[in-house]
Amino acid sequence: MNILLISPTQSGIGGIAQHVQGLKNFLEKNENSIEIISSENTFTIPVKGLKNPSFMISSFLKTKFKKNFDIVHAHNIPSALAMKNSSGKKILTIHGIFSEQINQLHGKTSGNISKKYEKDALSWADVITVISKESYDYYTSLGYKVIQIPNAIDI
C-alpha cells in the first residue's frame, strides 16, 4: 500500500512524534510504502501561535503535488487540511481534545476558532481515531463515530 502520514512533528521525544515513527517503522516492515509530511520537511514559522497555522498551510500546499495514496493518515487537527486535499481513504487520529488544548495554551478566542475548524476537520475524515477514553467520550458526545486505539509502545 502507498500511505501518506501527515503529522505536525515526526522527530523528538513527544508523544505524536514517537507514535508516527513507530507506525512508520511497523508499516514499512510490512512492505508498505510510507511518505511523511511534517514540520521537519515543510515551512513553519517557529513562533508560539504561528507554528501550527503555518504547518497547516505549507502541508496543504505540499499535498497539491502528492497524489495516488491508498491511505492518508493525519495526526491531530492541524494535519487535517492537508489530509482533505489528498487522494485516498482518510484517517484522522486525534491526540487529545484539540480545541481544549488550544484554549488552555492560547486563550479562549483561539480555542473558539479551533473548535470551529475542529468540527470541519472531523467531517473530512473517513475514520476518526483517538488515543484516550477522555477523547473518545468527548467526540462521541458530539455525535461522531470514533474508534479508540491507545498508542502502542515498543518494548
Where are these regions (language model features)?
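N-terminal subdomain of nucleotide-sugar transferases
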Residues: 1-40, 67, 127
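Short N-terminal targeting/anchoring amphipathic segment
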Residues: 5, 62-79, 91
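Histidine-centered beta-alpha loop that forms part of the nucleotide-sugar donor binding/catalytic region
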Residues: 8, 75, 94-97, 150-151
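A short, charged, and often flexible helix/loop element on the N-terminal side
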Residues: 37-64, 103-110
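Active-site proximal beta-strand in glycosyltransferases
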Residues: 70-73, 86-103, 129
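Membrane-proximal helix-turn-helix segments that form the acceptor-binding/catalytic region
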Residues: 109-128
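Carbohydrate-associated surface elements
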Residues: 131-134, 152
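Acidic anion/phosphate-binding donor-loop and adjacent secondary structure
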Residues: 140-141, 152-155
